[in-house]
Curated annotation (Swiss-Prot):
It comes from Schizosaccharomyces pombe (strain 972 / ATCC 24843) (Fission yeast). GO terms for cellular component: cytosol; nucleus. It holds the Pfam family Atx10homo_assoc. Induction: Expression is up-regulated during meiosis. It comes from the Eukaryota. This is Ataxin-10 homolog. Its main location: cytoplasm. May play a role in the regulation of cytokinesis. Keywords: Cell cycle, Cell division, Cytoplasm, Meiosis, Nucleus. GO terms for biological process: cell division; meiotic cell cycle; regulation of cytokinesis.
Amino acid sequence: MEKMESTEEWEALLSSSSNGDELTMKLIRNGLAKGFKSQKAAGDAGLYSRFLPYHFTESVSNDSFSSLPWQIFANSVAGNSPLQNEAWAFLMDNEDFFLPVPMNPAQCTALEIALWSLIRVDDQRLFELCHSKSGIRLLSIIFDFDSHPDWLREDVMFNIAERILKSNFPNVLVNVASKIGPKSIYFLIDCMSHKIKLKETATGFYVILDVLSCVGRQFASVLEECFTKEISSAGLDHINHFSEIVMLGVDLLYRDYVSYDTTISLKNDDSSSLGDMEFETSQPSSSISEIIHLLAVLDKRIPKKTLVEKTYASSMELQELYNAVVGVKRECVRFIAFICSKFSTAPDLVRHFNGVALIISQANYDDWNPYIREISVLCTRLLLQNNIENQKIIGGLTPITTTHSDALEEAGFTSYINDKGKVVLQPKTAKNSH
């Protein structure tokens, strides 16, 4: 195909495509790939004023599943295209046209490529993408991994995510993903663990805290619902993803940030490393609150698994639920331990959110959460170190009763708490005479 660089040629070609003929549409797509002059001529011929609005509208399109209009759009803004400003206005400011939601992965990929071409080096467009109603809608479309989990995504998605996360407003993307669902949130945290280089930066730290805060809140809510109505396969799938997000998020903190000194300060400066920043108490507050709440729900709803009694599950559904949250309680305690080891104000926040006694109560063996006892002991030490108020809470705790054990019953023993607050183990007959 020869280069078409005249407006007249493009007007004729665009006019002949009104019936959506596949061959003509491919000629347009390939023609736009020829470069700057072809793109400009197509724009002058009405690519954005007539052609694309017509073919993007499902009611007049011969095939709403065709990816050709989307590929034409992507090619029209590729490289140093002179149509980028017009294309951006077409997406963001067009009151007469509403971009349809992609119907298949090919359409979505073309939209992603076009969007990346438009924001790759333009900070103003990036700002508008993250702060306008139209921009948030676009982000909600391309970052929706929950509606179409089987769609394959191109590496350009990582580029878009990295561009936004490294900007001054990474929380926008976290908020968008959290409103969509756990698979979309998981994509972000997975990006950070493999593709996106945010380690040892304030941005990466804040993103992880934001993710854990959002997930903690949603995770606790979904768990509570599981005990009020039948557990659905979709609900169980969400819980599995929430569990993975919590464990991966906490692991990222330890992998990328644990090496810093205890006295760490943070400020909102993307170029600085954690060790150089001033810390504001409000930053980890939400994540601490939500993770403590999640831990409380898990502690209430998920029984400990011990060598004596392997499980308390009364149904296969509950057994699947318990398996889905294996290790989450441990990671919640591990997160609190990390925050307390880094920030001197964190133990006070844990106390404020009623987490001190909760952390101490995790210092038991639990096969669902290997090493939770040891991590809880470490976390308790961090909570009490040079903190008189937390020490008072510990001093005021008294044992209430012992837990039932079938193994002790079968062996003819029982346990109780004596007047001095000590646990006593003795034969049943001796207890009765006592």
